[in-house]
Structures are given as C-alpha cells and as structure tokens.
Amino acid sequence: MFDDLTAAGYSETEAYKLIYKGGLTIKSTQDLTMQTICDEEANNPSNYPSDAKYSFQLSFEVKKADGSYKTYTNQTMLSFYKKKTNNDDFSINYSSPDECNAAIAQYEQDVLEDGDSIVEGSEAVNITLEPQVAMTVIDQSTGEVKALVGGRGDKSGNRTWNRATDTCRQPGSTFKIIGCYAAALDAGGKTLASVQDDAPFTVGSKTFNNYDKSFGGFTSIRWAITKSINIVTVKTLQDIGVELGYKYAEDFGISTLTDSDKNLSLALGGLTKGVTNLELTGAYATIANGGVYLEPKFYTQVLDHDGNVLLDKTNTQNTRTVIKDTTAWLLTDAMKDVLTQGTGKLARFDSQIAQAGKSGTTTSNRDCLWAGYTPYYTCVVWGGYDDNSKQSGKLTSYPKNIWRNAMSRIHEGLETKDFVQPDGITNTTVCSKSGLVPLDGICDNDPRGSMLTTEYFDTDTVPTDSCDHHVALEICADSGAIASPYCPNKTSKVFITGAVSGSPEYEFMADDTFMNTICTLHDATSLINSSPTTTDPTNSGTTPGSTDGTAAGAQTGEAGTGTGAGSGAGTGGSGSGGTDTGSSGSSGNSDR
C-alpha cells in the first residue's frame, strides 16, 4: 500500500504517516476463513517430515582488545565453521532450540580472543522452526489475495519477515510453464504433441540432465509437463528462443528477472534472483484466468479517517492478456495430467472439482514447490530452509500435503466445476513419435506397438505434415540389409528416423549408414532360382514379391518416384501423456 500511496502523489513521509498514524480504513481482500485454514495447515506438524529442525537469526557485538568493535551474525557463524571444518555443506540447523543455544554459546567462545568482550545487551537471537513455508491463495477471476502465509511457527512480532512477499527463492520446474511452455504453445509454433528427443544433451560446457538421469527418446510436450522432463523443456526453449520465453515470463508478472537470466536455464527455473511466492502465484492465476493477468491486490479501497477514498482498486487494476485462452486451456489440460499420472498425484484432493498444477524442486532439494489451481482459486506453496540447506528428496512432499489439505477445506461446499473449454480447440489423431499426421500402416506398426494417440490442439496449429520419425523399408530376409530388386525374399519393417546418439530410439533407428547399405547377396539369377516372397508388416503372412525393380526401398505416406529405391518419408505426431514415454525430469537446477 505504501507504493500505491506514493504512486498516487503522496510523499514517502506522508504515506508513512497515513499508514501508521492516519487512522485509515482498509477494505481488505483477505478471507478470514481461508486465512485460518492456511495458517492451520502451514503449522500442522503432520504435513511435514518428522525430523523438524531449528535455525536462528543471530547478532551480537564484540568490543575488541584494541577498542574497536565487530559485529557477528548467524552468517558469519556459518562461514566460520564452513572454513574451520573445510565443509561447504556445514549447517547451523539443529534438532532443538536448546541445541541452537548451545551452538551459539560455543561460537561466542570460538571467536572471542584475549581481551575481547561481548557488548552487554547487544545479543539478539530469534530461533525458527525449519523447514519453512510460504503460501498464497488468489481468486484468479479478480486478482484478490484471499490468504497469505509468510512462514510457520510462533510469530515474533508485527511487520516481520514475510517469506511470501519479501523472499525470492528458486521456482524449479514450476517455471517450465511460465518461462518456456506458455510461450512455446502461444507463439513458438509448438503444440502439446510436439516432440523432442529426450537424450543426452550438452550446450557448450553445460550438460543438462533429468532428475533421475534416464532418457525417454521422442517425448511430447504433454508428457514432459506431466513427468517434469528437463531435457525436453530445455530443447523446446532452445527451439523457440530464450528471448521469447523471457518476455512471456515478464508478461506473467515476474519482476525479479535480470539479463543474466537470458539463457537456457530459464526453462528450468534456474534464476539469478529467484521469484517471490506472490508473483509466482499471480503467474499461475493468469493461466487459471484464461490467459489474462490481473495484478494481485490486497485491498479494494483505502479510506481516510473522514471516510474519503484515498485509493480505489475496485474497478481499476493492472491487467493484460498474456496468452490466448486456447493456450491457457491446453496448458491446464496438460497440468491436469500432472495430478493423475505425473509428479503431482500426492497434491490431488478428493473432489470432482477440476485441479491442475505443476511440481518444482531444485538442486539438492533446497526448494520444493507445488503450484496448482482449480476453477475457483490458485495457490502456490513453497518449502525450504531459510539458509538454503539441502533437504532429503524423500522428505520434500510437504508443500503438496499443505496444498491438498488446505485446498480441500477451502473448496468444501463449492459446486463441482471443470475448466471451461474455449472456442478454437479441437482434437485429432497424431503419431506420438513426431506429433504429426500418422503414416497409414506405418506409425501404427512401430516395433513397440501402435504409436497413434489423440491430442488437443488450437485449431490454428493442427498438424498437416506427415510423420518424419517413421519409415518402412523392404529388407532382404537373407542379408538383413535393404533389399535390392534381385532379393527373392523380402520383409517390410518399420524403423525410427531422426534420433540422436544415446537416445532410447536409437535401437529402432535406420541411420544413414543402414539407409545406404543395399543387399549384395543377390543378383538377377537369384530370381530365376528362387520363388520370391514379401512380408507385409501389417499382415503376418507373405505375398508374392515384386520383380519389377520398384519394390525395394522406403515406404511412406507420399507416393514415391523412381525405380530401385522406394518412396520417401512422411510425418507423424507426438502423443498425449498416456502414450508417450519419457523419463521424469527435474527442475531448477535438477528439479522435478
């Protein structure tokens, strides 16, 4: 509100006096019932790992023997012991407040030298329960902040540190939607069916990995969202351009970005400063609101002591369209899968009300998040240690627990709703290995089974090209090479094309060497001495072979030309979550 008053023309001094001494009436957007629910769930021990820790804020002043003064804090304490133990992972989180006090006393002994003394009354200690949390609930249809949690544990005072508004932390994989996929679907020419080869990937000196270090081959954007796959996300941002992803993130209301964030790590939420919980919630509320950003607001009106309106946000609000309503719906549909098939199953609460969301963790689980929404409300929960300490990966589910339990209570008694599908959405069958139009008899005869799937599209982005990741070749049954016109026994086999080295697809790949290797076992006399046969991949039996010199080669969706070598390749499509395969990814720096 201070910024709003100064923006309205009041000086900083006037604004301060009005807020703290002016007898203002503030019409808050806070819902007391929701706030109580969020406070209770944020402080409910059953939502957290059993091994709670305690950290502390420390400050004391020492008068040195030479008469100078030096201030010591919890940060100097941490640096002191990291250096003393030669351990960069040294932590000053302890199992009880008593252990904290004992550690502080030991530190004071360790830093005091002969003739030094602690200045009386200078010591200040504030012990904090860890891990900590931040939580924001927004009504996306109005932008009103209904509840805000700045931390858990006993409140030490008024106007204290609020982790939801005052602290920037890494958003991890929750930023895949904000910094990559929203832009990719809205303006980058991508669809939920678009695929990337989930395979080893290095750009310059930076090697990107999925959180479980596995690879899934050709993987659709839908499945990459569902399973939080890093490599697919980074390759997608590389395709559409970092500048585009950065611009969209800014449009979503993320104000903490810097030019140093204009790199591929943007896709994974590896940011210079991080984001606030409030702004991340506002970004997800934009998607929930059909792509329209409404600046989060904490009040509707501010009146002076005489009842005069000083500030009015009832009908005035910073608003803009960030993404098309079709893009918002497609992202939402993919994020619904996260709760049913992906990394967010634990977050889902028992209700017929539709739910969508995205998980996020960062390197060594220093941050863990769940960002989710319903047709009613958007809520983001962050968890982590104030000093950025590591967390066990098995103990980072508490943001999902808090979100599930709080949102379940908030939605009690509300009417069952789904997200409204806008005009301009259609569905069609594609090949899940390319995201394009399937080749008849080929994409459905991949060695692993049919790769056909149905996906939703904006009507302007429905694929028209044919699959470019499948090809059918006539193979000599005797040599295993591509059949020549003289091979008497041929079989038609479907191969993958376009995979990179290290991809799981490579096992089924017809690479350039194979494509240029024609059988040399047979010549014209082979047809005289043998009864030729050809095996059709769609039929287990055999059919009479062709001897006119046009049967050999690649079979595709387009009519081929020429003799000796067959026709060219078509195109196909990448699939929706349930049919594509891909490794679960991680984000931030190693998130999922």
Predicted regions and their residues:
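A penicillin-recognizing enzyme superfamily signal
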Residues: 28-71, 76-127, 131-139, 144-149, ...
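Soluble, non-transmembrane domains of envelope/secretory-pathway proteins that act on or interact
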Residues: 204, 355-356, 360-592
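Active-site rim segments in enzyme catalytic domains, especially the processed small/beta chain
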Residues: 164-192, 200
